[in-house]
Swiss-Prot record:
This is Kunitz-type serine protease inhibitor textilinin-6. Residues 1-24 form the signal peptide. Expressed by the venom gland. The keyword Secreted applies. It comes from Pseudonaja textilis textilis (Eastern brown snake). InterPro entries: Kunitz_BPTI, Kunitz_BPTI_sf, Prtase_inh_Kunz-CS, TFPI/VKTCI-like. Belongs to the venom Kunitz-type family. GO terms for molecular function: serine-type endopeptidase inhibitor activity.
Length: 83
């Protein structure tokens, strides 16, 4: 195969990897945890993955503790948990 063909194949495989969603079997278990505001009162917007809705949803986070299903951005949540 020519170097141009190899580069095209590599580019297509990279694109496929980026665009393929996380499958439920590859999704971290913490993505199944419910949203947890935590005990603090430094309220800020955060995102959690909702297995029932199959999407990342914004919620109010207290700023400490909570659980691992807590992301600063919707993009971070989707790249980690969304299927």
């Amino acid at each position: 195969m020519s170097s141009g063909g190899l580069l095209l194949l590599l580019g297509l495989l990279t694109l496929w990897e980026v665009l393929t969603p996380v499958s439920s079997k590859d999704r971290p278990k913490f993505c199944e945890l419910p949203a947890d505001i935590g005990p603090c009162d430094d309220f800020t917007g955060a995102f959690h993955y909702s297995p029932r809705e199959h999407e990342c949803i914004e919620f109010i986070y207290g700023g400490c503790k909570g659980n691992a299903n807590n992301f600063n951005t919707q993009e971070e949540c989707e790249s980690t948990c969304a299927a």
